[in-house]
């Protein structure tokens, strides 16, 4: 079990992010609840052993995030059957320069859509992080937190790869000042397809 662990505020999006993404996948069913559009950003410093997507570690990988792509994301998200947007990577919270404007726009123009994000940070670490990360967190509905730990791998977990990771209701957690687990947690009853990406 190895990974990198930052000191609070050590990793700064404005210093690391190159404004790039690995992929954008519209209309999928595996990255959260319902039909979702998933944005995979480039760059991650955690480097979890057994990571399913090592290709996302480099901040220079992939393609530039563009205004044209953002318009496509918004158009896809506007479809009535799409429940929301999912932010993955790479590490979304090290790409706040891209994601904060996008998420703010979604909140303004498509406020009925939900936003999920995965992160290598734990909730407790996030509470000690930089203002940009905390602002992005405040705009998200559901957070899957924590590093992937291959010694705790479990394919029966819903939307997670290892049992140390949690599915957190962000708004309830922020309001209550402590972690509140997503009330639709359904471990062991989801298909392999929903967890295989971990």
Predicted regions located by residue number:
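Conserved Radical SAM active-site core
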Residues: 12, 16-22, 35, 53-117, ...
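Residues at the C-termini of beta-strands that transition into short coil/loop
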Residues: 25, 119, 147, 171
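Cysteine-centered iron-sulfur cluster-binding motifs in ferredoxin-type domains/subunits
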Residues: 36-51, 91
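P-loop/Walker A phosphate-binding loop and immediately adjacent motor/lid segment at beta-alpha junctions
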Residues: 95-110, 153-198
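Short Gly/Pro-enriched loop/turn and capping motifs at secondary-structure junctions
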Residues: 122-124, 148-152
């Amino acid at each position: 079990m190895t990974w990198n662990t930052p000191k609070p505020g050590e990793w700064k999006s404005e210093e690391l992010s190159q404004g790039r993404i690995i992929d954008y996948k519209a209309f999928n069913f595996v990255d959260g609840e319902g039909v979702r559009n998933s944005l995979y950003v480039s760059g991650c410093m955690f480097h979890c052993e057994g990571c399913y997507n090592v290709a996302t570690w480099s901040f220079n990988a992939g393609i530039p995030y563009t205004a044209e792509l953002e318009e496509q994301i918004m158009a896809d998200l506007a479809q009535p059957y799409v429940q929301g947007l999912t932010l993955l990577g790479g590490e979304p919270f090290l790409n706040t320069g891209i994601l904060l404007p996008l998420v703010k726009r979604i909140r303004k123009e498509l406020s009925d859509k939900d936003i999920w994000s995965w992160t290598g940070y734990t909730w407790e670490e996030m509470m000690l992080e930089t203002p940009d990360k905390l602002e992005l967190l405040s705009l998200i509905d559901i957070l899957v937190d924590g590093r992937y730990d291959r010694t705790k791998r479990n394919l029966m977990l819903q939307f997670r790869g290892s049992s140390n990771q949690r599915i957190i209701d962000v708004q309830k957690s922020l309001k209550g000042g402590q972690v509140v687990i997503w009330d639709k947690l359904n471990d062991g009853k989801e298909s392999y397809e929903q967890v295989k990406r971990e």
